[in-house]
Regions:
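A generic structural-conservation signal
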Residues: 77, 200, 331, 391, ...
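Structured non-transmembrane domains adjacent to transmembrane bundles in polytopic membrane proteins
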Residues: 57-76, 86-181, 406-588, 610
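Membrane-embedded transmembrane helical bundles of large multi-pass transporters/channels
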Residues: 1-47, 144-409, 510, 519-724
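Short hinge/gating elements
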Residues: 48-51, 412-413
Length: 724
């Protein structure tokens, strides 16, 4: 490990390991907690979940939105109330619909407009379908761009108020609220419940795992409290970062606590494992924690730094939601790492060895590391036939990766909920009597109005266009046409229509026309996400390779590690795609999932490989590559496996949430971590290192061989040591 990391570790060890300074460390963290804690509760308020907020400024749909500034319908979103009866609406139904309309205009509109600065416009007469079975009431809602948070609640509160007027409808008459405002209300309701649910689920799981791992009724409190402080601090600083302009979405807000709990607990496991070993060697707990910090801090700093660097590559993304996850996630890892290297060891020192009751580590006793025997047997089994092992594991990973044939990116705003929410049910009712795109028309903005008629005719002939509105809305930026599509405006089929509409309009008006609206925004978002994949994936690999090369002082070993993690990634994505299609029956995969999964699995997979290979390199210096690999795997197996189970468990808690995208992210990363823990790190990496031999350390001096000590060369035995 680099000398600079060791120097930093030595400096860190003096604070939480000091007889007086340990209390100062705890006091500083408590001050930070009380200062930042109140901001943590505001973290959800800083989240943005409108696709238009994620797009780069040069996206055509964003330019169209900017061009509409000053139009009568600027900043307007509709709440569409859909009524439907199989066989046709009755006279009683139509009378009830008129009563609902009157209630919206008199009670809902009057009450909301009196309390907020936004505007709920008058709801016009119902639009009846040609078959007489479906009716629509459209309620325009306008929220000024600079409106307060109270005014912005119009988009969520108005649909809820309208729903309250639907309780007394005639039997058999179905009614739901949909449209952009309806989808917004459902999304906000789901995202508002995410953070509390996720925090409870993640915290409960980590608590349970800590109790099982340490088999102590009290010791779990120390690492759990340390991780909880890191999580609260991260959320508070996350609010400040979001307030400074970094985009935080509900998705990244859901991932953040999982990342902090998982990584923080992993680092805690490594620290506690070494501290417990040192308590068996040293009577003074202060000496024990200082040695433990000196030996584990460089590895934790190196692995955490690698994860931070990988996450920061997300900052290069065009999609601001993805770019925002970079600094937010990196900050979470940094705080978790800092907490586990400061307040955790300080609390461990204050508590002393009695905190481990009933399994108290005493000086001179043997280490209670029963799994070392099992992991030594695994290591020696790999060493007896490394070629057989790496060929077999690659074959298994290839079979898992074959699930990629089920990969599709059909998950959209319209089907992102795991449960049938009102807006989705309303869309289904709407499609029974109207073109599917009536829910959210596509906007065509013509800046040169002399070309308006030509654009209208060209767009009307474009594939997938049901109709172009006869009304023309005019404003400072030109004129706007509303285009209704044949497809659900939030479906991939509708997204695929946008290029044809743009081409048809541009053939007539050139640069004087822009196509926007919800469907175009989703299309542009997917295009930007694809661009982000092409840019960030190779950059992340190069960054991780350079860090590994510096840490291991080699080129071959980092290439081997990166290759194995890439295999692990494709295997995890393949397993995920298979389960999403054939077991969970999800409509598709989130387009952002491959990039998120890649960055997280590369970062976290390399994380565990650093834990392993740092020890292997250390052992190789004395025992040679073969014996060093066996020793390294044997003495790190138990703690890294525990860490992998904790991290996989924390990511699996995302599955409790009602959003398909977060469930997919949690499942894929959890599977990937388990693959990396039990297959890649335990079998594939050691087998490849043993197969390659000393050249794996090229171009360092180790590539020329560093044989074992003479006494071990003579006996052929490999002496086991406690983990360091």
């Amino acid at each position: 490990m680099n000398q600079s990391l060791r120097n930093l570790a030595g400096s860190l060890a003096q604070l939480p390991g000091g007889r007086r300074t340990k209390f100062a460390v705890i006091a500083v963290w408590l001050v930070v907690l009380f200062a930042i804690g109140p901001l943590a509760g505001k973290f959800e308020d800083a989240q943005e979940n409108d696709p238009a907020d994620y797009l780069p400024a040069n996206a055509e749909s964003v330019q169209a939105l900017d061009q509409l500034d000053g139009f009568p319908s600027d900043d307007e979103a509709d709440a569409i109330t859909v009524f439907h009866r199989d066989g046709g609406l009755t006279a009683e139904d139509r009378a009830a619909i008129e009563q609902v309309r009157a209630a919206i205009n008199d009670e809902v509109r009057g009450e909301i407009n009196a309390e907020r600065s936004g505007t709920v416009a008058e709801t016009g007469p119902p639009l009846i379908s040609s078959d007489g079975a479906t009716a629509l009431l459209t309620t325009p809602i306008t929220v000024p761009e600079a409106a307060s948070g109270d005014a912005e609640d119009l988009l969520t509160d108005t649909p809820e108020e309208i729903k309250a007027e639907l309780d007394s409808l005639p039997s058999g008459l179905e009614a739901e609220v949909t449209g952009p405002a309806g989808f917004s209300a459902d999304a906000v309701e789901v995202f508002n419940d995410i953070n509390g649910t996720l925090l409870l689920a993640t915290g409960a799981l980590v608590l349970l795992l800590l109790i099982v791992i340490y088999r102590s009724p009290i010791f779990w409190i120390i690492p759990f409290f340390s991780v909880l402080i890191a999580e609260v601090t991260t959320r508070g600083l996350g609010y400040l970062i979001a307030d400074a302009g970094v985009t935080v979405t509900g998705q990244s807000g859901g991932i953040l606590p999982v990342l902090v709990f998982g990584a923080g607990t992993d680092y805690a496991l490594l620290m506690v494992s070494r501290y417990r070993e040192e308590l068996r060697r040293r009577e003074d707990k202060h000496d024990a924690i200082r040695v433990a910090l000196n030996r584990t801090s460089p590895v934790i700093l190196a692995s955490g730094g690698t994860v931070i660097a990988a996450l920061l590559t997300l900052s290069l993304a065009e999609v601001s939601g993805t770019a925002g996850l970079g600094p937010i996630g990196a900050m979470g890892i940094a705080i978790a790492m800092l907490a586990m290297l400061t307040i955790l060891p300080a609390l461990l020192t204050v508590a002393g060895r009695k905190a481990f009751w009933p399994f108290i580590p005493r000086v001179g006793t043997e280490g209670a590391d029963e799994t070392h025997g099992a992991w030594r047997r695994v290591a020696e089994w790999v060493a007896r036939g490394p070629r057989r092992v790496w060929i077999g594991t690659i074959a298994v990973l290839a079979v898992m990766a074959a699930g990629l044939v089920f990969l599709n990116s059909d998950l959209t705003t319209g089907n992102m909920f795991r449960d049938d929410v009102d807006s989705v049910q309303g869309q289904e009712l709407l499609e029974a009597g109207f073109p599917a795109g009536a829910n959210a028309p596509t906007n065509v903005v013509v800046t040169d109005t002399s070309k308006l008629d030509g654009v209208r005719e060209a767009v009307a002939e474009a594939p997938g266009v049901a109709e172009v509105s006869p009304e023309v809305e005019r404003g400072p930026g030109g004129a706007k046409l509303e285009v209704t599509l044949d497809e659900d405006p939030y479906s991939t089929a509708a997204f695929d229509l946008i290029p044809g509409i743009r081409q048809a309009a541009e053939e007539v008006a050139g640069d004087d026309v822009l196509v926007g609206g919800p469907t175009a925004e989703e299309y542009d978002l997917r295009q930007s996400a694809a661009r982000d994949n092409r840019l960030i994936v190779p950059i992340a690999l190069v960054v991780v390779f350079l860090i590994l090369a510096a840490l291991l002082r080699a080129i071959v070993a980092p290439l081997v590690l990166i290759a194995t993690v890439i295999l692990s990634y494709f295997a995890a994505l393949g397993v995920g795609a298979f389960f999403f299609e054939n077991v969970f029956d999800f409509p598709g995969m989130d387009p952002a999932l491959p990039l998120f999964a890649f960055v997280f699995l590369v970062a976290l997979g390399i994380d565990y490989n650093i834990f392993l290979m740092a020890r292997v390199r250390e052992e190789t210096l004395t025992h040679g590559t073969r014996d060093g690999t066996i020793r390294g795997l044997a003495v790190t197996g138990a703690v890294i496996t525990s860490a992998g189970l904790v991290l996989a468990g924390t990511f699996s808690t995302l599955a409790v949430l009602p959003l398909v995208s977060l469930t997919e992210i949690g499942f894929t990363i959890a599977v990937g971590v388990l693959i990396d823990t039990f297959i890649v790190r335990s079998l594939l990496v050691p087998a490849l290192v043993l197969e390659i031999g000393d050249p794996v350390w090229w171009p360092s001096a180790l590539a020329r061989g560093a044989g074992p000590r003479p006494d071990e060369r003579a006996t052929g035995r490999i002496a086991m040591e406690p983990e360091s």
